[in-house]
Amino acid sequence: MRKTFLAGNWKMHYTSAEASIVAKQIATEVKTLNDDFVIMITPPFTALSKVSECIKGSNILLGAQNMSYMESGARTSEISPSMLLEFGVEYVILGHSECRLYLAETDEIINKKIRAGLKHSFKYLILCVGETLDERDSGKTLDVVLSQVKKGLDCVSESDIKRIILAYEPVWAIGTGKTATKEEAEEVHKAIRLEIMKLYSKSASDNIIIQYGGSVNASNIKELMNEPNIDGALIGGASLKAESFLSIINNVR
């Protein structure tokens, strides 16, 4: 049985002090959690150390928003896998649409990051995929998304796919207030799961966690999670306040 995985992506919000306050509020309220339910938050790099201390021993796990595929060297502004592990990071988001857009990350670069991360002790790497509004309107959604899946997972073995989470995040629904309908989201999630079966095996397909991301909130989370191939959510704006993030959590568990 696949776990339910809710991840809060805080993007470029909060100083260390601000992030610590919100992290403490969330950790304090989530006192008990079933084994099949996972909650993660990804503060900015500068807040990782303090947030790690705040959630230590709690039911909240620590993630990072990106990383370099290089271990060290002349890579100004980047952060390596080992640096993240030093802070207690267990999960890393890779290939987010904002990184693809603003940092010009290609499928090939994202694949290098996936392969680099798999050489380290992260529990899971979250590979994000999704189409733009123009691509959806042109009927290219599945072609684009499945291509991103295949390229992102290039050279990833059957054993390593167990450490990959996929997140479908339609670019047109991120930060816009627009959300894919449950039917639209389920169609893509189902196609992704079938693609994993083609690339790997039925077992890999049955077990891989596929999240939805795109203006998720307390009002729409339940209907999204009722779909058979949606296993969780990658949550942006609604995860920034403890109250709204906790409402989402409580509407699911």
UniProtKB/Swiss-Prot annotation:
Pathway: Carbohydrate biosynthesis; gluconeogenesis; Carbohydrate degradation; glycolysis; D-glyceraldehyde 3-phosphate from glycerone phosphate: step 1/1. Its EC number is 5.3.1.1. GO terms for biological process: gluconeogenesis; glyceraldehyde-3-phosphate biosynthetic process; glycerol catabolic process; glycolytic process. The active site is at H96 (electrophile), E169 (proton acceptor). Involved in the gluconeogenesis. Catalyzes stereospecifically the conversion of dihydroxyacetone phosphate (DHAP) to D-glyceraldehyde-3-phosphate (G3P). It comes from Borreliella afzelii (strain PKo). This is Triosephosphate isomerase. Its main location: cytoplasm. GO terms for molecular function: triose-phosphate isomerase activity. Homodimer. HAMAP family: TIM_B.
